[in-house]
A protein has these predicted regions:
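Non-catalytic N-terminal targeting/anchoring module and adjacent flexible stem/linker
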Residues: 1, 308-373
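PAPS-dependent sulfotransferase catalytic domain
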Residues: 1-203, 268, 276-306, 318-323
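Phosphate-binding beta-loop-alpha motif at adenosine-nucleotide cofactor sites
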Residues: 26, 197-224, 272-276
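Generic recognition of well-ordered alpha-helical segments
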Residues: 39, 139-142, 219, 223, ...
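Short, surface-exposed acidic
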Residues: 50-52, 225-235, 245, 300-303
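Alpha-helix N-capping/helix-start residues
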Residues: 211, 230-231, 279-280
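C-terminal alpha-helix
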Residues: 219, 223, 227, 288, ...
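PAPS-dependent sulfotransferase catalytic core
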Residues: 237-289, 313
Length: 373
């Protein structure tokens, strides 16, 4: 990246034309986002074979690319704090929408919500979203390989609220092509994008893309309002067969790989967790994500009873937390009423037993409703 950071002259306050806007391909990392982008690349380039180098340079971009942040702010993106990144993401999205005359396909791993009071998405420029979700039990191993983590560390990262995707050292962060990306936990990410109905959002499971590929991709294409026949979709699917893509990466490499000695297109399997995760690790994933896993049919049959217990315990805890909050608010209101000037014993602050809990709320990431934007 150049050392000169020139701010765009584009007026970011101008309205979009009817032909402009963003189509987001959103997912938690290692959930099929790049494979889906390859599919769209094949769909747009019917006469061409898949060229990973050409694909990386010419099909879609990410809303976290440092070059976009430099254009919007005119400063070195490496100098930005997490709060500044969060505040700039919606501006980058508007910039990307305005700089193209047509609708732009954009990749994002950013959580849909708020950080420090700032919305992470500008839904006024987003025309459609494809949200790809994958069983977190399979994500664990793939994410661990991608980041160079062990499985336990991957599980912990996926369960961490306020989690940011970034390299570990400042040197690697400065060299990375993207700024840090706000993901939150796996459950926060899923809830933020799928928790409220929105006609613009098409949700597709990675497992359905793998096992009913043509039908599932046709549903995605139809959801975006693209006029493509089943035959055209099937042709694009054939060109992006996972084994073929793996062979191309093995021969020429792939620019989106984080670690040089590791594969980006690892296995692409469903159910691989059964051979990779221990019983304790499976339970740890379910313990953190039971509610969202249950919504999408990801809880293995043999763990149904365990997951049920987790969800009952969680709901009970939420009930007591809510009760404690209401009691604390009532007590604080009573204290203020007694402390008003002119009242008897004004200025006295009686000792009140305030219920305490180890649970911190609210979360730094709060799901926003796209339909209200």
């Amino acid at each position: 990246m150049s050392n000169i950071f020139t701010k765009t002259k584009l007026d970011l306050n101008q309205p979009l034309s009817p032909t402009q806007g963003l189509i987001l391909l959103s997912s938690y990392p290692k959930s099929g986002n790049t494979w889906t982008r390859l599919f769209f690349y094949a769909l747009q380039n019917r006469a061409k074979e898949i060229d990973l180098d050409h694909f990386a340079k010419n099909i879609s971009t990410m809303d976290s690319q440092k070059t976009h942040f430099a254009s919007v702010l005119g400063v070195d993106p490496n100098s930005l704090t997490q709060q500044e990144i969060a505040e700039t993401i919606p501006k980058v999205q508007r910039y990307l929408a305005l700089k193209s005359k047509n609708r732009e396909l954009i990749k994002t791993h950013t959580a849909n919500g708020e950080f420090g009071g700032t919305p992470t998405m500008d839904f006024s420029v987003i025309r459609a979203v494809v949200y790809i979700i994958r069983n977190p039990l399979d994500v664990v191993a793939s994410f661990a390989s991608h980041m160079g983590y062990g499985f336990d560390r991957s599980i912990k990262a996926m369960a961490t609220s306020k989690n940011w995707l970034q390299a570990e050292t400042k040197e690697l962060r400065d060299e990375a092509p993207q700024v840090a990306q706000l993901m939150g936990s796996w459950s926060e990410h899923v809830a933020g994008w799928t928790g409220r109905p929105d006609p613009r959002v098409t949700v597709v499971r990675y497992e359905d893309l793998k096992h009913d590929t043509v039908v599932s991709f046709k549903r995605v294409v139809d959801g975006l309002g693209l006029r493509k026949t089943r035959a055209e979709v099937a042709e694009a699917v054939a060109k992006t067969d996972f084994a073929q893509i793996q062979a191309k990466e093995a021969k020429k490499g792939f620019t989106e790989t984080v670690h040089k000695n590791q594969k980006f297109f690892r296995k692409g399997q469903t159910g691989g967790w059964r051979e990779e995760l221990s019983d304790d690790q499976v339970k740890e994933v379910i313990r953190h994500h039971a509610f969202q896993m249950n919504r999408f049919g990801y809880i293995p049959k043999e763990y149904h009873d365990f997951a049920k217990g987790v969800m009952i315990e969680s709901q009970t805890a939420k009930h007591f937390i809510a009760e404690a909050r209401r009691e604390r608010q009532a007590q604080e209101k009573n204290i203020k009423r007694r402390s008003k000037p002119g009242k008897k014993n004004a200025g006295e602050r009686p000792q009140v037993a305030v219920p305490r809990t180890s649970v911190m709320f609210p979360s730094a990431i709060k799901a926003q409703n796209p339909t209200n934007k």
